[in-house]
Each structure stands twice: as structure tokens, then as C-alpha cells.
Amino acid sequence: MKYMTVTDLNNAGATVIGTIKGGEWFLGTPHKDILSKPGFYFLVSKLGGPFSSPCVSARFYVGNQRSKQGFSAVLSHIRQRRSQLARTIANNNVPYTVFYLPASKMKPLTTGFGKGQLALAFTRNHHSEYQTLEEMNRMLADNFKFVLQAY
């Protein structure tokens, strides 16, 4: 199993939405419409080697919410240090680039992971009403390792 890298995210079509440090936006806050989108948010520290793509430190997913808090709720959990992961991110004084990837673009990282372009074209998409973000999150854990997360 390999660590997920920025190259994997870029190949899947992820976009950078900003940078956080200690659970706060660093160098500007993205618009609320961007932060409330359902999908996956990946944190990448800039501590990659000179010839390697930086590894993804952690991943979070956000579903549809009535409150439209989205990724802002994740940052709140980090600031409140509600888990070991949140305490680490809040206290390590490391800036993390935040990448966003909607569930519709997750195929190369989940069911299509490790397949060539032709095989990927014939791999099923995630359109089932029973396919949850939690299941996609588990597929990510099956396919990749993350620096700060064990699962």
C-alpha cells in the first residue's frame, strides 16, 4: 500500500481551496459556498522531499448538511481538539494545503485505483443511492496510507 500524494489528487481532478494552520485559515478564507460543498477534503503538508510529491496527511469527508457548515465544521473540531488527529493538526504548527474533490471524481482513487486508462473507462462510477461517502472513505483507506491517519 502506498501513501496518497498530491500527484494522485491532481490526477483525480482535485482543486486547492486554501491553506490552514492550527485549524484556522492561513492566507485568506475561502467563500462559504466552497466550504459547504459535499465531498472529500484532503490536507497536505508542504514537507515533501525535493524530488517527491508531498504525501496527503489526512482526509475528511462532508455530506449534505442542513446547516451548510461543511468543512468549517471540520475546522471547528480541529480547533476544539476533539480527537488525537485534531490535537496533532492544531498543535504541530504546520501549514496544510486543503484540496477538495467531489464524490463524482473519486473513481480514480477508489474503484478505479491501479487500473490503466482503458480499464478505468470501463470501471463503474459511484451513482448508487446506496453508495455512501463512508464507503468511499473506506475504499480510500484500503488503497492508500495517510501520514496522520491509521485508517
Swiss-Prot record:
Q: Which GO terms describe its biological process?
A: symbiont-mediated perturbation of host cell cycle progression; symbiont-mediated suppression of host DNA replication
- InterPro entries for this protein: Phage_Ndd (IPR009514)
Keywords assigned by UniProt, alphabetized = DNA-binding, Host-virus interaction, Inhibition of host DNA replication by virus, Modulation of host cell cycle by virus
- Report a single Gene Ontology molecular function: DNA binding
One Pfam family name is Phage_T4_Ndd
Record bears the keyword DNA-binding: yes
According to its UniProt entry, what is the function of this protein?
Disorganizes the host nucleoid and inhibits replication, but without host DNA cleavage or degradation. Only the architecture of the nucleoid is affected. May act on the host chromosomal sequences that determine the structure of the nucleoid. Binds to dsDNA but not to ssDNA.
What is this protein's name? Nucleoid disruption protein
- Give the gene symbol: ndd
